[in-house]
Structure formats: structure tokens, C-alpha cells
Amino acid sequence: MTLAAITYTRGSLSILNQLLLPHQTTYDPLHSACDAWHAIHEMRVRGAPAIAIVAALSLAVELDALAANNQLSPEPKEVEVFIREKLEYLVSSRPTAVNLAEAAGRLGGIVSAKAEVRGVDGREVAEAYIAAAQRMLEDDVKDNRAIGEFGARWVLENGVATGSESGSEKGKVAVLTHCNTGSLATAGYGTALGVIRSLHATGSLERAYCTETRPYNQGSRLTAYELVHDKIPATLITDNMAAALLARNRAGSAASVGVSAIIVGADRVAANGDTANKIGTYGLAVLAKYHGVKFLVAAPRTTIDMNTKTGADIVIEERPKQEVTRVRGPRAGEEVDGLRAMETITVAANGIDVWNPAFDVTPAALIDGIITEVGVVEKDASGAFHLARIFE
């Protein structure tokens, strides 16, 4: 059973507080768009697909509550304006993640179309929104499984399978991933981690490697948590060990399996294939190119922004300096009522300036393929992606 980052029933929404993982499993209820804005901005929920779904469902829950308390306007246009303003507010919580903006635009269009229908009232407009938001949750899991299957097949056909000379079972692959792209970042199963899950399910995965992913440690806190939960053979490395991992194949050690592919997620893919993802992704792509390792981006089509021509047009969110200068976690070995006391530790010199971009942009030239729910997009002979074709 995979982890659930989002639990939803009609009128009720809770998220797994990812700031407390892997030490505590706590679900936070969200009752409104305002609750979701803070949860997203504080990164209690993260991952581009999950952010969009939580934002959409939070407003669905708020609309349900307003209707139940007879506080919803009977005027369809007033409800339309209310929904659009809330969606615009939600988009401001994490501007780099295109899924949220895409969902807001799509949901806003559905609401506007419903409001134009002769004879409808405000409640029917709200119902149209709620139904569309709920479909997002269902579609995301289905799309993620398709991404996993397409990606696994591509890696097995195009990656370099590990061989018996390195102590591995012939025909299996080892994959390196970055940040967290699994059930905790989506409605379920995951994108890049979904590919790893699919490889594992078919017995084709030798080992998964996950980076620590500084400064927020989504790899060590979240991806490692999912891999252990699913009993997938995995090894954690710090971010600055990736080059050594790709360069060496030491028999008899934990790092004895050669890496066949690097698979990452995305927060926004530009029309030319340039990809914004968690800081450190660009460096991994450079390392992959140098070492002849396949580099893949796994993302649903909702992450592809055809209105953004290149990565130069992507706005990169910058995070607080405390995320770099401080580390938070439980005190080792001491428990009170079954819980270990959480502490925040300073790890940098006071007064030092900090630059903390949340994302970087990987040029399309370094990407071998973009795995979507309708297949893997590869570049043509001239080295260009043609992403518009998957929307036809």
C-alpha cells in the first residue's frame, strides 16, 4: 500500500504534514482556500501535481461549507467571480509550479461556461467546480501509473542494464532520482518515483538511489521514507556524491551497481523542453551528459507550459535563508510519550549572506526524454523537442 499525501471525501480534506516526516505522521485538515495557501507556501504539502490538487480541493471544501450554511450567493456570476478570485489567490502560493496555474485556468473556464448557461443558479456553478476538482484527484493517479509504465519501458529499452560483472542480476537497471516525486508529491504513485515503482513491480529494478536534496532534504526525509515504506532496494546519497556515484562501480560496496538512468520530476516544462525542477537538477543533468547516463524528466502534460517558450521565461521562486542556515529534526534517542523532541539547529555562521533559489532550469539539450502519461517524447534529429504534438 502506497502512502497517501492527500485524503479527501466530499466536504473534507486533509494533507499529510510533510514538514514532520519521516519522524511524525500527522494529517492537517484544510477547510478553506486560505488554509491551503498557507499549507502550500509553508511546504507542508509540496510537489507540483499535489499542490494543484490540494488547492483545487480546498476551494471545493470551502464551497461545500458555504452551501451547507446557506452562505453561497444564488447569483451564478457572483459565484463565478468568488471562485476566480480564490483561484488567483491560490496560484500566488508557489508561482513556479505550473500545474497550479494550469488547473486554475482550466477550472475557471469550467465555472465561467457554467455561469453562462441560462437558468443556472450559484449552487449549480459551485457544483460544476466541485465535480471538476474531484476529477483532478482521480485523473492524477491514473496519469501517474501511465507515466510509470511508459518510463519503465523506455529505461529498459534505452538505458544501460547492469550486468553480472558488477555483481548485479543481468537485465536489471539502477536509477538515481532527486527531490521527491512520489505519492507525497502527487495524488498517488508518483512521476519519477512512479517509474521506479513500475520497474520494481516488474522485477526490473536493481537499486534506486536518492539524493538528500538540500536544503529542504526532500530526498532524505520524503523519498527515502517512501522507498523504505514500499520495501524498494534503495541507497541515500548526499547531493555532492552524485558525480562519484556515476564515475565509480565498486564491487562489493553499497554503491556497486552502475546507474542506468537519472529520472527527475518537474515543476514547469517550457515549450522547448527546458525544465524547471528542484535546485540541483541542472547539475545532475550535466553529470549525466558527461558520464553517458540517460537523463529523463517525468511529468504529466499539465506540467508542460506551451505559453512559456524557454526556460529563460520561468520565474524562479527564492526561499528564506533560514532553510539553508538551519536544520530541524528530532533529538536522537530521546522520546517523550513516544515522540522525540524536535529541535532547530544552526549550521552556518551568523551574518553570512544566503542565496536560496528553490529551483533551477535544465536546458533541453541535456534531457534525453520527457515521460508523460501519453508516452515518452524524444528529440528529433536536430535535437529539438516537439511537445505540441502530445496535445493534438
Swiss-Prot record:
Highest taxon in the source lineage: Eukaryota
Residue numbers marked as site, Transition state stabilizer: C179
Catalytic activity of the protein: 5-(methylsulfanyl)-alpha-D-ribose 1-phosphate = 5-(methylsulfanyl)-D-ribulose 1-phosphate
EC number(s) per entry: 5.3.1.23
GO molecular function: S-methyl-5-thioribose-1-phosphate isomerase activity
Enzyme class: isomerase
Cross-referenced InterPro entries: IF-2B-related, IF-M1Pi, IF_2B-like_C, Initiation_fac_2B_a/b/d, M1Pi_N, NagB/RpiA_transferase-like
Keywords: Amino-acid biosynthesis, Cytoplasm, Isomerase, Methionine biosynthesis, Nucleus
GO cellular component, one term: cytoplasm
UniProt keyword Cytoplasm present: yes
Entry annotation: catalytic residues: D267
Pathway: Amino-acid biosynthesis; L-methionine biosynthesis via salvage pathway; L-methionine from S-methyl-5-thio-alpha-D-ribose 1-phosphate: step 1/6
Function: Catalyzes the interconversion of methylthioribose-1-phosphate (MTR-1-P) into methylthioribulose-1-phosphate (MTRu-1-P).
Protein name: Methylthioribose-1-phosphate isomerase
Organism this protein belongs to: Ajellomyces dermatitidis (strain ER-3 / ATCC MYA-2586) (Blastomyces dermatitidis)
